[in-house]
């Protein structure tokens, strides 16, 4: 590079250093994209811009990548290490790759022909200043060109809202070997690069925004809403104009009013907020979503729902991953001033809790959702319907998912892909409120005052986690499970084919399983699990560290699922981090530290334990069975786990089927033997007295679950003809009684939804027959097994309440007592 050019770039770089603070996507391109800085890199940019080139250079130097301003010298040939696919603001050359780029590609390909050891990495990079999608009708292309003046103002105004996006490399060696090195291949390479950048920009910016009134007019003109308006006028005996006004009012209530400027402002506020409140936001598998967006998929984000913070956190994360924030289905309870208007401009559209009895509302909402898909907007909704009060996944609500399938049946939309997302926190700001609600307190209505009270309490929230799970492409799913689904496509009428409900239910279950498959273990949920396992809610520092090591080794050596994230820190580091969260107390004496979970915190900490309960439930069950029997054969262990596994699978959305248990249990048992928690005696597994403490703590993780199952099986065995509603109610009442008598500090222990799921599973598994009666020999088999795994005190309390209902239905223990009397 000549001296004058160096001076020119240095002068140009001065204002850029002051004005530009770009983000890198992905955050660690060398590792995430598998770049090799020791091999030559050819940087490919979409169009000629010195500001883009210097912004790229700054990030390359920060990432220890080769300087794009330094030319490459290969076999005596000197070539620039960057190339622009298009010239600058000359619009007439926009659609044709400029000759210089084609020539440079050809020169590089030609070098590979003469040098078989050469392999240059072609690295596409896009630099974006601002992400305004523009308004419909303005004709702004997705790969727009800015002249010098426009670029100056873009850098001045949007320099801190810019990002440098590195894409996967293309091996020029592979291109030369597979496709040749002539000029036609170079032209194709330039054309493919142009298409790549155009798609990438669309994924980052999204489609142009419609004028709100134009959108409403289009919806009103749809056949479905026209018919619903006519039905509204006829059923309510009002004029057609009045019915149409009702429809418009519903659109005003529902529809988002997306504003890029609001998103940009909120990004600054949220960046300050996250940095102040959280010690880090950990994002995993975002590249999956970036690739889906770039491949043209219509993305539906389906996260679990822990907190009102979820709405903001996920949009913030997606924005920082170079993706357009989605339109979010938010509960109508959040449509209060000032939150409602702000959320609406951030992309929220509002949904009522129920559609029943309001055909006009359901039609307007369904058509609006379908219009979002047709226009190509990404959408987000919480498949659980509401925030989990217990820390576990809730039974899915399938209404919006059903409408998503119906949107596909309108035809014409891009391929829709569901992306499950696990959101986790080390501190959920509403957790205290959740505990009160589970104890029976009335849910407080959302308001400005409540929001301000919540914000006042926010501090030291630890880490946040956003893990993108395994995507579920709807077209592929329907092709496999409902081959005839295209026969139901109707662009006018909303379809409800016979296969819709079972298909939606199966899809919902798969989504929940994939959310759990992407869970995040962290310092808070691991420490909470260990301390809650101790009956006194306290452990010495050494005992707690030993237990953390046990959990970590199980999760690392026998991963629950490929997408689960496990901390890389040592137990000491995790404990120190958890103690800094000020949830636990430390008592010091001459012997050492004792870590205590205060009584008032115990109920709240069950929330975090429940986030990862499914990850440890099978090791806990193995530990329980070995500990109570002291010696058990592998076959008997498998039989006992097999009896209750369907209930665990339904309750915790476990991903393995019962038939897979032998393959699932084998590595877990081997790991527990390796940790010397149990001993291998041929076909038998034996308790190891030297490691009884960690085994007891591991076993305690499933203690309350087994007690709940024992309650229901006991009632069902004593009264086989009890109806479903009464069974759920009596189980809940007895669980509350046990909670009081035995100090069980887990709100979900008597949660209505948990017992409802259990009873539904018992029916599905044949414990309750078609006429609603229990098959007593089956329920007794399970109860007798469970009664060996719970403490005598708990067993006595259960049997003293449930068993007198019918003498001939009593277990042997109680029947014997009555005979003696």
UniProtKB/Swiss-Prot annotation:
GO terms for cellular component: plasma membrane. It is found in: Cell inner membrane. It is a peripheral membrane protein. Its EC number is 2.3.1.15. InterPro entries: GPAT/DHAPAT, GPAT/DHAPAT_C, GPAT/DHAPAT_LPLAT, GPAT_PlsB, Plipid/glycerol_acylTrfase. NCBIfam families: plsB, PRK04974.1. Keywords: Acyltransferase, Cell inner membrane, Cell membrane, Lipid biosynthesis, Lipid metabolism, Membrane, Phospholipid biosynthesis, Phospholipid metabolism, Transferase. This is Glycerol-3-phosphate acyltransferase. Belongs to the GPAT/DAPAT family. The HXXXXD motif is essential for acyltransferase activity and may constitute the binding site for the phosphate moiety of the glycerol-3-phosphate. It comes from Serratia proteamaculans (strain 568). Its main location: membrane. HAMAP family: Glyc3P_acyltrans. It catalyses: sn-glycerol 3-phosphate + an acyl-CoA = a 1-acyl-sn-glycero-3-phosphate + CoA. The gene is plsB. A motif (HXXXXD motif) lies at residues 304-309. One of its GO terms (molecular function) is glycerol-3-phosphate O-acyltransferase activity. The keyword Transcription does not apply. It holds the Pfam family GPAT_C. It comes from the Bacteria. SUPFAM superfamilies: Glycerol-3-phosphate (1)-acyltransferase.
